[in-house]
Design a protein with these regions (language model features):
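Active-site-adjacent pocket-lining segments in enzyme domains
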Residues: 2-8, 12, 19, 26-39, ...
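Mixed-charge, low-complexity segments
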Residues: 43-44
Length: 165
């Protein structure tokens, strides 16, 4: 089974990965969905779900097939920067990374979106949340965009996010 890792943290937007995870985790897809956190302590989502991560950032499998970064206010507060080594690993190994809502700003701030087509909540908001962002010319006013193994979507695009490859 190919593993899909969904990054969870206190305050993660639990509805954003719901459609894609339900489809990927279905029988006969060849995929299984697992969660990754900074540690293996229970995380509480925006909706109040208590979720214990399957993996921590120190013990995740190297052969995962997709990394999903969900939204949440922790991205705005710069509390999720510790996931950067996992994202770097995925990008360097050409493993697709999906980012939705505020997680897109993290991708922008760290240079992943500077040279590829992408979406996000709004260009103006992204620029306020990602001062080092240089991808203005590649921003598309679209619900979701896929380019170079990176999938981006605004916070209202959970279905479109699930459909991108």
């Amino acid at each position: 089974m190919k593993e899909v890792l969904v990054f969870i943290f206190d305050g993660f937007a639990d509805w954003e990965p719901a459609y894609i995870c339900a489809e990927l985790n279905a029988p006969d897809t060849g995929y299984t969905v697992k969660t990754i956190g900074f540690d293996k302590k229970a995380k509480v989502s925006m909706g109040g779900f208590h979720v214990i991560p399957d993996y921590s950032i120190n013990d995740y499998p190297s052969d995962f097939s997709l990394l999903i970064l969900t939204g949440g206010t922790a991205w705005i507060e710069q509390k999720n920067n510790g996931i950067l080594p996992v994202v770097d690993y995925a990008v360097n190994k050409h493993i697709p990374v999906g980012a939705i809502c505020n997680a897109v700003n993290f991708m922008a701030e760290n240079g992943y979106l500077d040279t590829i087509k992408h979406s996000g909540n709004t260009l103006e908001f992204m620029k306020t949340q990602a001062p080092h962002y240089k991808g203005d010319n590649n921003f598309l006013e679209a619900q979701a965009v896929s380019d170079s193994n990176i999938i981006t979507a605004n916070g209202s695009a959970t279905l479109e996010f699930a459909k991108k490859k």
